[in-house]
Curated annotation (Swiss-Prot):
The gene is araG. The complex is composed of two ATP-binding proteins (AraG), two transmembrane proteins (AraH) and a solute-binding protein (AraF). Pfam families: ABC_tran. This is Arabinose import ATP-binding protein AraG. It catalyses: L-arabinose(out) + ATP + H2O = L-arabinose(in) + ADP + phosphate + H(+). It comes from Shigella dysenteriae serotype 1 (strain Sd197). Keywords: ATP-binding, Cell inner membrane, Cell membrane, Membrane, Nucleotide-binding, Repeat, Sugar transport, Translocase, Transport.
Length: 504
């Protein structure tokens, strides 16, 4: 039940950076014993607000009110001492120190300048037990999993008696089991009467945890949903992006050209039976299937990431011998991989380098000198045309959001002579607004005659974007559906594993 008096209030919060107004007149309330979700596209202002709450930034206008008292934090330590803790996506812990040392860093119990390790480990053990964690407090942090690191960060907040705990995209690096454990802990913290702020683009998490949802757009407050029985996915999307859900996908019927890509009885590691399919010029074909269906494995084989063990790939009626990715690229077939951070981007290189790295070889001067003029113009062109949000082309790509990293990878392939593009989970980990931009790029590629084959486990996305849906099940094709005729029931029915009959 919502209390009459909020524990945390934002009153007219504004934040201006040189040339940029990040927040404008943000006002809303949060209550003790509730999980209050913050939603919005990248750049909507969620993280900026958390940094104001945590003392990283001072507001340009407005104030933060905690338990009826107007607060002004000079730094994060002041905020933490006032009971405010932020659990960021990138955890702020020291791997070489023990679990207990990390929990009580800055307030280690000591006497005469000597740390009382017995008391330290005892107190840390109590915090870990509170979270249901069976971890030896004397274990060096570096030996723990990311999920356990997160629990240590939460224990650190509890050790400082935090009454307000904010989570910023906390599940991005967690396994399903670790996510379940995190949700258990958050629900316990809610029962204890703490204010929980939760930032995520994953709507299934928002609906599973939240008692209220506040939506931001372009640095402004849009609305707060407090009746979770009356809010649904479509209403949230419309509040976040100002468009109906149908407009997010934006599919329209189009005409296709001749067959551009054909697989003839292709097998690859993880693909159980020979796969045969065709994609025409200008056609978008979606590959849908549950985990283990073989979608990613098929694409890796087609691109030369693994070896095709049988069958033949054809582009424009010509057989293509693909033994490594450079063979696929030379034939005009490009891949945006599922794991963009490990296989798509070069994290410690600039946006410019990541866009230009594939086509660079075609533009060198004298056969060996990088053509800086072409590289600068090409990168700037794709940054503008794809609306890549970055301070500049020299920004390290690892500092960009997932959506902007994906657009940079697309910019890389747009620099090549593309005939076929393979997209493996192209919008995973991307906010709704960036997804809309990715879909528009896909439609633009199709309009240029590119054959698009994209794999996704997001069924509404496949149904909303693809002209034709190929459903895979356990390494084989289970069936095909046309856009105008397909629905979720049909697609899921085809994707579900067959039930074996037990033999008596």
């Amino acid at each position: 039940m919502q209390q009459s008096t909020p524990y945390l209030s934002f009153r007219g919060i504004g934040k201006t950076f040189p040339g940029v107004k990040a927040l404008t007149d943000i006002s809303f309330d949060c209550y003790a014993g509730q999980v209050h979700a913050l939603m919005g596209e990248n750049g909507a202002g969620k993280s900026t607000l958390l940094k104001i709450l945590s003392g990283n930034y001072a507001p340009t206008t407005g104030s933060v009110v905690i338990n009826g008292q107007e607060m002004s934090f000079s730094d994060t330590t002041a905020a933490l001492n006032a009971g405010v803790a932020i659990i960021y996506q990138e955890l702020h812990l020291v791997p070489e120190m023990t679990v207990a040392e990390n929990i009580y860093l800055g307030q280690l119990p000591h006497k005469g300048g000597i740390v009382n390790r017995s008391l330290l480990n005892y107190e840390a053990g109590l915090q870990l037990k509170h979270l249901g964690m069976d971890i030896d407090p004397d274990t060096p942090l570096k030996y723990l999993s990311i999920g356990q690191w997160q629990m240590v960060e939460i224990a650190k907040a509890l050790a400082r008696n935090a009454k307000i705990i904010a989570f910023d995209e906390p599940t991005s690096s967690l396994s399903a089991r670790e996510i379940d454990n995190l949700f258990r802990v958050i629900r316990e913290l809610r029962k204890e009467g703490r204010v929980i702020l939760y930032v995520s683009h994953r709507m299934e998490e928002i609906f599973a945890l939240s008692d209220a949802i506040t939506v931001f757009k372009d640095g402004r407050y849009v609305r707060t949903f407090t009746d979770m029985q009356q809010v649904d996915h479509d209403a949230l999307v419309q509040a976040m992006v100002g468009r109906d859900i149908g407009d997010i996908y934006g599919w329209q019927p189009r005409s296709y050209g001749e067959e551009r890509l054909r697989l003839d009885a292709v097998k690859a590691p993880g693909v159980r039976t020979p796969i045969s399919l065709a994609v025409r010029s200008g056609e978008i074909v979606g590959l849908f299937g549950l985990v283990g269906a073989g979608r990613s494995e098929l694409m890796k084989g087609m691109f030369g990431g693994t070896q095709i063990t049988a069958g033949q790939v054809y582009i424009d009626q010509q057989p293509i011998d693909i033994r490594k990715p450079s063979h696929a690229i030379a034939a005009g077939m490009m891949l945006c991989p599922e794991d963009r951070k490990a296989e798509g981007i070069i994290p410690v290189h600039s946006v410019r380098d990541n866009i230009n790295i594939s086509a660079r070889r075609k533009h060198v001067l004298g056969g060996c000198v990088i053509n800086n003029g072409w590289e600068e113009n090409n990168a700037d062109h794709h940054i503008r045309s794809l609306n890549i949000k970055t301070p500049g082309a020299e920004q390290l790509i690892m500092n960009l959001s997932g959506g902007n990293q994906q657009k940079a990878i697309l910019g890389r392939w747009l620099s090549e002579e593309m005939k076929v593009i393979l997209l493996d989970e192209p919008t995973r980990g991307i906010d709704v607004g960036a997804k809309h931009e990715i879909y528009n790029v896909i439609y633009a590629l199709a309009a240029q005659g590119v054959a698009v084959l994209f794999a996704s486990s997001d069924l509404p996305e496949v149904l909303g974007v693809a002209d034709r849906i190929v459903v895979m099940r356990e390494g084989e094709i289970a069936g095909e559906l046309l856009h105008e005729q397909a629905d979720e029931r049909q697609a899921l029915s085809l994707a579900m594993p067959k039930v074996s009959q037990a033999v008596a």
